[in-house]
Structure formats: structure tokens, C-alpha cells
Amino acid sequence: MVPTSYYVLLSAILFTIGVLGVLLRRNAIVIFMSVELMLNAANLALVAFARERLGVEAQAIVFFVITVAAAEVAVGLALLVSIFRTKRTADVDEVSTLKG
């Protein structure tokens, strides 16, 4: 049986990769994927702790977070496609939707 600390370490590494992707990349799709990686890292940590102590309640929370992440994917991709169609770029530095 794999110890919980390994899952938590993997979760921390994945979350760090996601944070670095958000901070260092300028492509909107890569930033979006990095945010999803951060959500999945948090889910992995929660499941690891639930496996050891919390039980079914934490697994229900993970299911809810996955549902919210799926909705975020749908809305986020729709926004990215819409912005790409109007601006013809996915670079967040070149796209400023607040300008007229």
C-alpha cells in the first residue's frame, strides 16, 4: 500500500507546476490547462486524505469539485474560442477585452 505522504507530495508537485504555468506562460490555453492542473492536484490531495481519515464525505466533495471543474472547462473554452475568433490570438498580453 502506498503511503499518503507520496500522494501529497505528488499533489504538491502538480500544484507547483500549475502555478508556474499560470505565472510564466502567456498563452491563454496553457494558462487554462495550468488552472485545471491545480484543481486536479487539490483533488488528489483531498482524496489521499479521505482515503486515510475522512471517508465518504471528502469523496463527495471531490465529486462536486470535479463537476465544477467540468463546468469551468465548458465556460472557459467557450470564452477562449470567442476571444480567438475576434482577436485572432491566444496571447493574453495581446488581448485586452476591456479596451474598446
Curated annotation (Swiss-Prot):
Q: Where in the cell is it found?
A: Cell membrane
Query: Highest taxon of the source?
Result: Bacteria
- The transmembrane segments are 4-24, 29-49, 61-81
Q: Name one GO biological process term.
A: ATP synthesis coupled electron transport
Q: Which GO terms describe its molecular function?
A: NADH:ubiquinone reductase (non-electrogenic) activity; quinone binding
Q: Which UniProt keywords apply?
A: Cell membrane, Membrane, NAD, Quinone, Translocase, Transmembrane, Transmembrane helix, Transport, Ubiquinone
Q: Which Pfam families match?
A: Oxidored_q2
Show the InterPro entries listed in the entry: NADH_UbQ_OxRdtase_chain4L/K, NUOK/Mnh_C1-like
Write the Enzyme Commission number(s) for this entry. 7.1.1.-
Its Gene Ontology cellular component terms are: NADH dehydrogenase complex; plasma membrane
Q: How does it sit in the membrane?
A: Multi-pass membrane protein
Signal peptide (residue range): none
- Kindly state which reaction or reactions the protein catalyses: a quinone + NADH + 5 H(+)(in) = a quinol + NAD(+) + 4 H(+)(out)
HAMAP family (UniProt xref): NDH1_NuoK
Q: What is known about what this protein does?
A: NDH-1 shuttles electrons from NADH, via FMN and iron-sulfur (Fe-S) centers, to quinones in the respiratory chain. The immediate electron acceptor for the enzyme in this species is believed to be ubiquinone. Couples the redox reaction to proton translocation (for every two electrons transferred, four hydrogen ions are translocated across the cytoplasmic membrane), and thus conserves the redox energy in a proton gradient.
- NCBIfam families per the UniProt record, alphabetical: PRK05715.1-2, PRK05715.1-3, PRK05715.1-5
| Oligomeric form and interacting partners | NDH-1 is composed of 14 different subunits. Subunits NuoA, H, J, K, L, M, N constitute the membrane sector of the complex.
Instruction: Give the record's family classification.
Output: Belongs to the complex I subunit 4L family.
Record-given protein name = NADH-quinone oxidoreductase subunit K
Q: Which organism is it from?
A: Chloroflexus aggregans (strain MD-66 / DSM 9485)
